[in-house]
């Protein structure tokens, strides 16, 4: 059984036991999380009906908090001596999917 969930403005295909990296979620490692925005569930039959999907929940636990790769930003304006250098690392959360409720 797998589900497609939406979190942090992105969609992820998850199954029980998967570890996914999502935008930072509040909580400490070991805390339980519910991914309620389920877009599709496929098990014995495919479910796409919004009324049925409202009952489905994907549960997981926070495995770790990490950072994404370093992104370097360099702004430059010609003939003025203006240089601005900046770096960014996006905070991420690793979530281990522990279950997908069928909502029946």
Swiss-Prot record:
Please provide the record's keywords in A-Z order.
Ribonucleoprotein, Ribosomal protein, RNA-binding, rRNA-binding
**Gene Ontology terms, MF aspect:** rRNA binding; structural constituent of ribosome
Q: Which GO terms describe its biological process?
A: translation
- Please give the GO cellular component terms listed in this UniProt entry: cytoplasm; ribonucleoprotein complex; ribosome
Domain of life of the organism encoding this protein: Bacteria
Question: What is the similarity comment for this entry?
Answer: Belongs to the bacterial ribosomal protein bL21 family.
**HAMAP family per UniProt:** Ribosomal_bL21
Q: What is this protein's function?
A: This protein binds to 23S rRNA in the presence of protein L20.
Self-association or partners: how does it assemble? Part of the 50S ribosomal subunit. Contacts protein L20.
Please name the NCBIfam families in this protein's record. L21
This protein is called: Large ribosomal subunit protein bL21
**Which species is the source of this protein?**
Salinispora tropica (strain ATCC BAA-916 / DSM 44818 / JCM 13857 / NBRC 105044 / CNB-440)
